[in-house]
Amino acid sequence: MRVRVSPTAPYKCNLTSFDLYIRDYTVLRMRILFIGPTRVGDTILATSIINHYINKYKSSEFTVVTSSVSQNLFKKMPQLQNLIIINKMRFSLHWLKIWSKVFIYRWDLVIDLRSSVLSYLVITKERKIFKGNNYDHKVVQFTKFLDTKEKIIPEIWFDKNDVDDAKKILPVEGPYIAIAPYSNWKSKDWALLNYEKLLQRNIFQNYTIILTGLSKDIADKEIMENLLSQKNLKVLNLFDVPLSQMGPIFSICDLFIGSDSGLMHLAASSGCKTIGLFGPTDDKVYGPWQNVVIKSKTSPHDN
């Protein structure tokens, strides 16, 4: 087919349909490389950046580099073209392997939250390298990083079908309160005995209690068994349920209570009212975004 083209246009005058497709695809599709954090909580907070660019560039395509513990968070991410998992190797050779997958492309934008050398070894029109601080909340830091006046919010991705599937996992009717008593650091955790005492209060009698986390983190197995077998409470054991399922489950809970952990941020980003229990970590930087923090001067485990 013949097309009239401006003399200044960089395209030849005799274009085929394939040429037009390639031209339009190149113009409309913005290719973005996102190098994300390692930990689940940081990754969830960083979804505020991804969502900002998804909304800004409706036809963009993302390649996301993330850790194995965070990969399930991206199952329903819009505009995701490729997900690259960091499987650590000796001498940091995993970065060479990742580079071999991304250097072949010309990127429109590279966003690097790790300040890694990888972002300097690819061709891109724009490169944004994040440098954090120890006093602003992470979302505030990300807002400054993006240099935007728009409100950015950490939100994970799931749909109505995911919520319907989540309801099928729950054999007992709600309303629900979710509790995640463990993190990856014992000093951040409130003693399990305190949760047992808390759940004896009358306010919890009308709720189904969801206990969740990783079973390998359970330190007080006897107390946990007592909690799970409470006769005056409806308690569900949802330990080791994947993150991709816990997000929709949290979205139908009335409240989340738990340690400073990835699950705390997952609950908050799913729209669940969240109470985060903090001790040695800084709630001003890592608190659940736009939710409630209870802070102790010492480790919650000691209280």
Name every feature range the model reports, one short phrase each.
Residues 2-10:
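Extreme N-terminal basic, low-complexity initiation segments
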Residues 3, 17-303:
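Catalytic machinery of carbohydrate-active enzymes
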